[in-house]
């Protein structure tokens, strides 16, 4: 991250404290590894944001219902950062700058609400784009394609990468989302671990007017008439096997959820900030019986479940994965209507779960621990 590097180069001993908030934001939002100097910058930057030195960031936290003492690197990367980024994607980045330069609470709150509204618009556009991508896959019979090339001319080019990432997560295939720009077609790609996207693009570079990227992500410009030839060429040269399309997750240890108590959650807190390069520990347990649940969020994209452990305890699990895929899996494994039964509080469905442990505040109540599931079986897990 250039911001963090510049701070360290300019003044290695006496870093300007008033810039730490922005260095922390930049480091996390630029997906830098939270190690060494980066870790220190983010940790100290979080402290300053919590103290409310910057009126704009304080207001942005308030409109997003983030309590200062609960602020973490997660909020920088997935709540505050997207709000600041949305205005650059859909309007002008000057509005984010105006927020950060606000001197009065009134000005800051006005700007923060506007940015939050823009981010909600960005989220809605993203959901619509994902739905349209699903329809495109069905309409163009792409279920057998190893590399998915999806043309959505009506999608705003600034959110093509976000949509590509979401579609990649859902199907676990390399994905290109293409949109219609002023000077031809533009697009973003997101890949899986087994597919080097930039190298694959280099093999068919004659179809691009411009391209760049790395193993897991890329950007491109091309002619509209070359979309189908590109799709055919990428799939013809692709050497991925069926095993490559099976999601895999590496856990730290298999551990009963009952072991996750206040003390353990407190010890994990000492390891923060978590993020790229310093991930939150992952655990797994088999035989968790899902009894009841309900969907949450403006777009109902996550859910809370009550589960019973093999040891006889009851735990709360918050699921941030693909609810549609989870519902289909339940209906296939336990019979049609199983998903409906679970949300009606009549579930009795054993599942294996990969989870994380952390504290969570919900409706003013702090719960310890809350276990966040990433994937439900069938999933390949390794320690």
Question: Language-model segments: which ranges?
Answer:
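Short, small-residue-biased leader/transition segments that mark boundaries at the very start
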Residues: 1-9, 376-380
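Hydrophobic helix-and-loop "lid/oligomerization" segment in the mid-to-C-terminal part
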Residues: 11-232, 254, 295-297
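Mid-to-C-terminal polyanion-binding domains and interfaces
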Residues: 105-113, 117-151, 203-375
